[in-house]
């Protein structure tokens, strides 16, 4: 995924720095789009793969690499076609990885928890829908004094708000 939905990097170290979550992107099926580099003294043509609306999009999987064992597991998130995975966040104990799965229409988001050991889905904590657009921009942030609660940022009512949730997926309150 490109610089959208709050994604500004492709790798995320665990809290202790012993595991690395990362995006793996296959864009071989995406049509090339020509861009002119106007910063060069003489303009140069650069082809980039960009999934235009209605055309085939890239496929992304999320992996977790263990440098000590040199093993990688991939999250069992199902078919990555026409889905975005964003807002990656580690559980404080690094046993779970949280991310938001967003459909290509960008109107249905799910906060999902995955096992770091197996890559299996532990559960969907909550879902957010909107008739027009859901734009998850920020990963969840766990409270430093209470690992059973986290803050989620959303514009679900048209304004940017912070929400306090429990790791059971239940809304505690709007902050």
Q: What label would you give each PLM region?
A:
Residues 1, 71-77, 123-130, 171-175:
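A short beta-strand motif characteristic of beta-propeller blades
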Residues 1-7, 79-85, 130-138:
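Short glycine-/Asp-/Thr-/Trp-enriched loop segments that recur within the blades
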Residues 9-12, 21-27, 52-56, 92, ...:
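Beta-strand C-termini and the immediately following turn/loop, strongest in propeller blades
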Residues 61-63, 110-112, 161-163:
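A short loop-to-beta-strand structural motif that recurs across blades of beta-propeller domains
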Residues 66-70, 116-119, 166-170:
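Short loop/turn segments that connect beta-strands within beta-propeller blades
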Residues 67, 71-103:
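Long hydrophobic segments that form regular secondary structure
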